[in-house]
Amino acid sequence: MELYLVGGAVRDLLLGRKPTEFDFAFDGSMTDFLSAHPEAVCVGKSVNVCLWHGRECMPLRGGTLASDFVARDLTINAMALDSVGRLHMHPQAVQDLRDRLLRPASPTAFTDDPTRVFRLARFAARWPNWRIDREAFVQMRAMTGQQLAVLPAERVAREMLKALAAPRPARFFRVLAQGGCLRPWFEEHERARYIPAGPRQWHANSVLGHSLRLMDELAGDAMAVWMALCHDIGKIGTDPALLPHHYGHEARGVPLALALAKRLRLPAVYARAGALAAEEHMKAGMFGTLRAGTRRDLLWRVNQLGLSEPFWKLADADSSSPVSELAYPSLEVITAVRLPEEWHNRGEESARKLREMQCVALAALRKKQAA
């Protein structure tokens, strides 16, 4: 029985990169493998997978290398390294690696597993200089909304979260848009493609185009990228008669951001961050003109949620001036305020007194900055 190193690990070795995941495949049945390796443990529920010395192993798809290669997602992942170091591959794999081309491994690659649509988009975000083969878009456009809708939310979310941390996160959504696959998981952003972000003197792009631009500016901070994706989501609910203005889009965006996070079954912090970005980004952009009480409440809320860094990064990217240069000194001032001992343990009175003192401190800071 031959055991092969397969998939992304082989690809990364050929690209001169250190593999982060190691998957193995063997050319026999599960029964044969377990007989040869009794210490292995079966762990797969829907597929035949077992753990052997901490490594995932499974039978070759279709029983042969050739059938395994065409059953994979992309040609660049359709490779295997045997126990003596011989390389086996999809006929187009090496050339596609050389050409930096993302190509489906077969004409049915995406219909065989529709999650591969999102995997392709994630690779595109990870490698912004790689091209996408025309066949990939042909297969994407042939997908139906129902084929994508039945996917487990966790699998879609996993690919998106990896893309948010990639060098060009917006490309994940651009590829999905180009292939007609934003719906149903990113329904709001499909609609955002056709809505102006605002008056021409401020925004030349659509709502989606504006959000994607900010996402790439914020690359390197995955939470800030997520918040950029959500911040203008409320604009899709603007009355067409009011366009290109979007009065009140902040409040409209909160339930939409929460619904998106729920649909993808994301951790609660993403729901809170998306809602915060939608509701408060306009205030953040006007931070220097806000009254002391409004500034205090905004700073306090963002800080209490543990989202100061990504939120103020978003505010800087979305504003014509670096508002964080005002926000962080203000945050230092209010967090340094200490409630006098006689005001301790008085419930709401204590909270009101602390807020009052923080507002006074912010007003004093503004006078000092203006002097």
PLM features: what roles do these ranges have?
Residues M1-A371:
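Catalytic cores of the polymerase beta-like nucleotidyltransferase superfamily
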